[in-house]
Each structure stands twice: as C-alpha cells, then as structure tokens.
C-alpha cells in the first residue's frame, strides 16, 4: 500500500507557483528522501500534507484515504523551524503536544517517560525548554514528533543541531521506527543521509518534480558504463573504438588506477575479460553516481547527456 500519494498537486501564490502539478507516491514502510534546493517547493508540499495550507489543485491520499482532519493523529511532523514553547517545562510540553494528537493524558505520560528514559534524559522532565541547549531541545522536539506512534513521520532537516553522536542516536531510532512499521519522509540537503538511509527519493526543483523512484533505480538511470580499474604492470591500452580512458593514476610499485568508459553495448563481464588479457587486475568496480552528483547536476539544469559526461568524469 502507498503511505502517501500526491496527484497533480499545484499551489499558486500571487506572483509565484510554489508547486506545479506534482505527482508522487511514497511506499508504506519506506524511508523516502524529498530533495531539492531552497525554495523548490518541498516545504509547500509538506505543509499541504499536514493541512497547514490547502492546495489549489490536485489531491493527497494517506494510506488510501483522501486527506482529512482525521489524519492529524496519523502524522508526526518535525518542521525545520522548531516550535517548542520556551517557558514550558519539558514534561508539560510533551504532554500538551501528545494530547493535541489525540492521546489521553495517561498514555501521553507513559510515552513521554518511555522516550526520555530511552534517551537517558529523564532528569529533564522539570527543566524549562529555554534552559536547554539547541541539541537538547532538538531531542525533545524529535520525541514530540514520534511519541504518539504515527504511521507517517515527516522530518524536515532532522539532524540540524546534533553532534555526530546524537545524530547517530537519532538515526538508529529512525531505522527502528521504520522497522516497526512507520513510513519516514526526509526533507534534507544532507546527501550522506540520503545515501545511508533512504530507499526511495524524489527531487523537486523550481516547483516541479524532476525525478523520483527507488534510489537504486535512480542511480542506475544515470550510470555511464564507467569502471574504475586497479591493476599492475603498464598503462592500459584499449581499443579506442570501444573504450575511452577517462583518468589514469600512477602509484608506487607499478600500481595504476584507471577510470575507463566503455561503449553502452559493452557489459561489465566483457570489460573484465578484455582487461585480464592486458594487465594484472587487482580490483574492478563500476562507478555508480552518488546522489550528490545527481542532485547537483540536475539542479544546475544539465541535460541527460551533459549529466552523464559529468558523472563519468567525477571519480
């Protein structure tokens, strides 16, 4: 089942189209990266899903049902602009926000304490939010997002303000939430997060969806039949009608690292067979474009051919 489906969603303002006929589907129990530069339309889509604003055209479905007010309790939303009440104590804050999502006070108390204990911060219960560091407040905001056990969790730059240790802690909790049945939507600029966590992605740029799909499928779409070869002996000599030497590095002890691009009709096993006859092969791998490569190139507006050339040159 699809956790979220947006169909032909458009949002216009007086002098600006924030979303232009965007359609995408987010599989249930996936970690979905919603990517794009600032002002692309990501936050507008998130606000529509959270019923903060309405679309001008199109429809949104949550687990097969048209978006309605009953979905408020199904969604957990961590906005980029954090919104805790600074004068409230941590415990009061968590209870208040959980009850807004439909939890009873007793259940909210139970869940709040469970998460504070999990993060080993139970002694923060009576601290005012204004007395917390940015990283500490981030933990409380994260807890408030997930403590009502939402089936759909939307995280807008969730690692902002965290040191590496706490970022890893939050990462582990996100994976655990996914494994326990939640669907996670990431809106992020951190491509390492996309590489490590996301199994599906969509890229929005200038209000339009540019690409979407399983991460591996997107990467495969932009492969350029380029291979990185480590070998000993001599510089590679390959038939120019079938291969292009993109880069060749010389290391100690006659060790070389050569990047080659093969014609599109040549398979990896054919390349290996040809190399074995010409050199002492020590390592062979296909060059897979990173999400950062794909993101930067598409946002720059390069066409497919220029993008493929760029990806073959970047090692």
Language-model features and meaning:
Residues 2-6, 11-205, 211:
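ABC transporter nucleotide-binding domains
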Residues 171-261:
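ABC transporter nucleotide-binding domain
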Residues 82, 243-244, 279:
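Structural motif
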Residues 85, 192, 235, 266, ...:
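Short alpha-helical
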Residues 263-315:
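C-terminal coupling/interaction segments
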